[in-house]
A protein has these predicted regions:
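Extended, amphipathic alpha-helical scaffolds
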Residues: 112, 126-128, 187-188
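Hydrophobic core segments within long, regular secondary-structure runs in both alpha-
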Residues: 1, 21-28, 42-56, 84-87, ...
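Solvent-exposed loop and edge beta-strand segments that line ligand/cofactor-binding
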Residues: 10-24, 37, 67-85, 122-143, ...
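Short coil/turn linking the two alpha-helices of tandem helical-hairpin repeats
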Residues: 31-38, 94-98, 149-156, 223-227
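A short secondary-structure junction motif
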Residues: 54-66, 113-121, 171-178, 182, ...
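Single conserved hydrophobic/aromatic residue that forms the stacking wall/gate
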Residues: 2-8, 12
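Terminal, non-catalytic domain-edge segments
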Residues: 1, 147, 151, 159, ...
Length: 308
């Protein structure tokens, strides 16, 4: 089967194309790292091949992937908003295994993205829980077409680059270019948080977070590709701003332990039922925040793999 979800909630018991994609993506980064030191893992290579082959079975005729499904591939949620998350491991699989089937599948995802998301400016349902317009769909779409532009040439490269620019502009509309005011006594204001450079999550989840991963790299690449310094300038704003809440001795930012980074940063009066504006929600997933910042702080990872 594909990678199993470990969360207890029923919404997470169903398989998610994004969760599976991110797991495969992480393993490709691991295998590429190991290759540099002449270490090989044929067992993991076979597992990844098997999983990517299952991706090929799961892909719809229009190039999309269902958002959620069961182990037997019966579809639970046929929404295609999570499709771009699958593009990344497909491109990496093509590069690693030299299997053109994976590149063909990745190209088909781009056809779907262009027709249903980019041309309509309708980026939806990429997050694991919310079912609405969200930042992550446009961010993932920009990243997906960025991957394809890196491994193609000529007219095809230019086309994917153009799609990347369009999706990136939309993704940037979720990011703050001003600092939300906080009242005296609200923790986020008292510690001096500046919201400029942070992204709102979605229509349903109205808080800011550090979901960025490779998007800063995408912006820097676009800046060079189109000689447009605004992209790299804002990547720098994001990079500096999102490190504000990293806890260390003497700068714990309301976090009790070093090594944790809050997920739900409540910058509005949107009612989550916990703590309110100016505070963290005490229900949060600590893992992905660290992974996102790790990628932000290690620029060039994908280009080092796809362009070598």
């Amino acid at each position: 089967t594909l990678l199993a979800s470990s969360a207890a909630s029923d919404v997470y018991k169903r398989q998610s194309i994004r969760r599976q994609s991110e797991g495969i993506y992480a393993m490709f980064h691991y295998l590429n790292y190991e290759q540099k030191y002449k270490r090989h893992h044929p067992d993991w290579e076979q597992r990844l091949k098997k999983m990517l082959d299952m991706f090929l079975q799961l892909q719809n005729p229009d190039g999309s992937f269902p958002r959620k499904f069961h182990d037997d591939f019966t579809v639970v949620d046929g929404s295609g908003g999570s499709t771009p998350s699958a593009t990344l491991p497909l491109v990496m699989g093509y590069k690693y295994f030299k299997d053109k089937r994976y590149l063909s599948a990745a190209r088909r995802t781009a056809e779907y993205l262009e027709k249903e998301l980019i041309s309509k400016a309708d980026y939806f349902s990429s997050t694991l829980d919310a079912n609405c317009e969200d930042k992550e769909a446009s961010l993932y779409t920009a990243t997906a077409t960025y991957y394809l532009s890196l491994i193609t040439n000529g007219t095809e490269h230019n086309h994917y680059a153009s799609l990347t620019r369009k999706a990136a502009y939309f993704a940037l509309s979720w990011y703050y270019v001003w600092d939300v005011p906080f009242a005296p006594g609200q923790m986020l204001g008292d510690i001096g948080l500046k919201t400029r450079g942070w992204g709102n999550v979605s229509v349903e989840n109205n808080h800011i977070d550090v979901f960025i991963f490779e998007f800063a790299d995408v912006l820097r690449w676009l800046s060079k590709e189109y000689n447009e310094p605004r992209f790299s300038d804002f990547a720098e704003v994001i990079s500096t701003s999102m490190c504000q809440l990293l806890p260390y001795k003497g700068h714990m930012c309301g976090v009790i332990k070093v090594g944790y980074y809050p997920e739900v940063i409540q910058h509005t009066n949107w009612d989550y039922g916990r703590n309110g504006k100016g505070y963290y929600n005490d229900m949060f997933a600590p893992g992905w925040t660290v992974a996102s910042l790790w990628e932000l702080l290690t620029p060039g990872r994908t280009e080092n793999i796809l362009l070598k």
